[in-house]
Amino acid sequence: MKKRIMAILMASCLALSLAGCGKEMTLNLSYGDRTGTYSGDVDENGVPNGQGKFTTTNDAGEKWTYEGAFVNGHFEGEGKTTWKSGQIEIGTYKDDVIVPIKGKEIKTLYTTPENFLHRCVEVVGVVFAAPEYVDDGVCIQIMADIKNHENNTIVYIHDKDFEVDNEDYVRIVGIVGEPFKGENALGGEITAPTITASEYEVLDYKDAVAPTLKEYEINQTQTQYGYSVTVQKIEFAEEETRVYIKADNQGSDTFNLYSFNAKITQNGKQYEEQDAWDADYPKLQDDLLKGNSTEGVIVYPTLEEKPFTITVEAYSSNYEEEIKPYTFNIEF
């Protein structure tokens, strides 16, 4: 009987040694050391490992608590952070920082926004109304589906110095709040998710709508009669392929080069210039006077990331100069 009691006591002591109980400790988090109180699972060295709760203060002195999964003293896995102010964030943590959910992970944000309450999300959109500036920041409305001009989202940015205008493209990371409910201009009821931003930036068209997936520096140049054409680089995106071209006229007359006369062939198929009316890409000048150069972007449909040929037709205003098509074999 005594042996059994001793065994139970030893097991209890071991269990207590592997669990913190309101113990003060310093965690070496990825953004700096934090000293606070920890309760929960620990390893044999007393380091938080498993499920636990850590309470500390930020640099501004505000108290906050993380409760969830720990790995080797770091927030790693599902967790929840609550600030004294009442702010809450829930989600998956990696290296002590919450990981925003985005893309297909938030496709139901606009049908059931209440399911994302306190979740950290990342959205990219276009501002579609005049921003409303207040004492402590700015409120903007964005369409997170830029292509279809849908997915109305209301964003609160607590930074009065942040400059943003109607029709700007923005990237937002923040915490989802209570859905906004109101009426549209026709009296119909609308519901829109709200986000309090922790990260925010103005983007250009390319980064917002067709971000580069892979970029290749090419820098191939061909010259005829002093008229040079250079394929500078290629950018592959999900929605399009961008070819950066430079033309330089050191010839005897005007050099005429039109982007619609630049064609790509790949795997037995021919691709022509694709309209990009909303893009702010630089355009090639058509009729280039002697001694001048021009640079621009020609947009094509989505191509495979495989070798292709681009043929650029051009001519000079000196009809005695017979200029053949500039043909570039692009390999990666």
What is each model feature region?
Residues T37-P48, W64-G77, I88-I98:
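Conserved anchor residues at repeat-unit boundaries in beta-strand-based tandem repeats, strongest
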Residues I101-I106, Y110-E122, V127-V209:
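OB-fold single-stranded nucleic acid-binding module
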Residues P131, N249-D253, E304:
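Short, acidic/polar linear motifs in exposed loop/turn regions
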Residues H158-E183, Q270-E322:
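Short, solvent-exposed, Trp/other aromatic-anchored flexible loops in extracytoplasmic proteins
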Residues T241-N249:
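Short, well-ordered beta-strand segments enriched in hydrophobic/aromatic residues
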